Amino acid sequence: MIFTKKVYILLLLGIAIAVFLAILFTQQISIIATLLFDLTVLGLAVWDSRRVKPQRVQVKRYPLHRLSIGRENPVVLSVQSWEKPARIILRDYYPLEFDVSKPTLTATLKPSSTEELTYTIKPNSRGEFQWGDIQIRQLSPWGLAWHDWHVSASQKVAVYPDLVGLRSLSIRLSLENTGTMRQKRRLGTGTEFAELREYGVGDDIRLIDWKATARSTRPLVRVLEPEKEQTLIILLDRGRLMTAQVQGLKRFDWGLNSTLALALAGLNRGDRVGIGVFDREVITWIPPERGQHQLSKLIERLTPIQPVLLEPDYFGAVTRIVNQQTRRALVVVITDIIDVTASAELLSALKRLTPRYLPFCVTLRDPQVDILAHTPTQKIEATYERAVALDLIAQRQVAFAQLKQKGVLVLDAPASQISDQLIERYLQLKARNLL
């Protein structure tokens, strides 16, 4: 039970009455009258608070399943009142590691009504987290006290990679495949026949299917699509550089999100997708397979993995791929680069992949470094920071240039944009038949 401001105002009023009685009567009468008044106020407040108990609202939290890291995940509480209106304050004991939109929720319910209260939480790390109970405060009928109690709602909730982003990507790819966005498909792109469609202005006349046209009343053209059943291998570094925080998440988490997004795109395009995670050794290897069941396997196997403070063995990871994968494949290495010296082993490892495989190096850039490098300043300390940022960018560009000279594809993008840009590059490679 918690007294409201109304009780404290009444108690202060008792003091004012005591002063007034002390003037008119004796001090003893004033003290006795004040004590009786205050005790009456407190007694009424306690009694008023107990009147809430039979009218306690019913509160429950809708079941929480998979939460997505780095996303605003909605949490919904259902509140039901009885015959009388209810004014309540709720506090849900979410994990302290999460960012939350509303620490407390307030509502005023009409008699015999149900209301849903929603807040969002944003996890910044993966794993299993403990949710606590729900604390409820309900205002008494006379407004003298808050009746306070807890509802048991403890549960464990798992935080996964960005499943929300995967769902959005899946919808987008499905729309492209089913024809809703098929107008974006370019004629003649790819090597496999996809469909026939009516000739349109600007279409290449070399793509007209004359036999089909002869059977029809209008000219028809062939639509080609990229070859399917190719192999996509993704190697995800979980070494020391991937433990750094970038835009609220670890580099590894950004890399894991982009890994799963690329895997989804590959599976959607009919390719065989395999993934390896490595530090000093390959700690997880999931052989290439086709089909949507492969995505579920990838999510379950990769979600528990965390980055470690170990230097990665690029050569060892690539060697394992070379020994196990005989077919030509696109090999995507998701990592980070500091300078030419630090990336020497990476360059040596990726050179081993050519020409049998198509190596693709993907790095996650920290936007804060770009901001420091391109923000003029007059302060000495900030000038030093800017110089370091400019040097870091220059060293990375030299390393990227060396990779490109050896036939390695390179993508360096801000961490928050890496998934979209990586998928776009992959679809371009498929369209150009470079695999």
Outline where the language-model segments fall.
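C-terminal "exit" segments of structured domains
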Residues: 418-435
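Acidic, Ser/Thr-rich peripheral helices and adjacent loops at domain boundaries
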Residues: 296-298, 368-398
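Short beta-alpha junction loops
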Residues: 281, 364-368
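Short, charged loop segments at secondary-structure junctions
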Residues: 286-312
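Exposed acidic/Ser/Thr-rich ligand/metal-binding surfaces
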Residues: 312-365, 412, 432
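Extracellular/lumenal glycan-associated context and N-glycosylation machinery
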Residues: 1-60
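Short acidic-hydrophobic, aromatic-tinged amphipathic segments that line or gate anion-handling sites
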Residues: 409-415
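An amphipathic, basic-hydrophobic helix/alpha-beta surface used to engage anionic
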Residues: 39-293, 328-335, 341, 348-352, ...
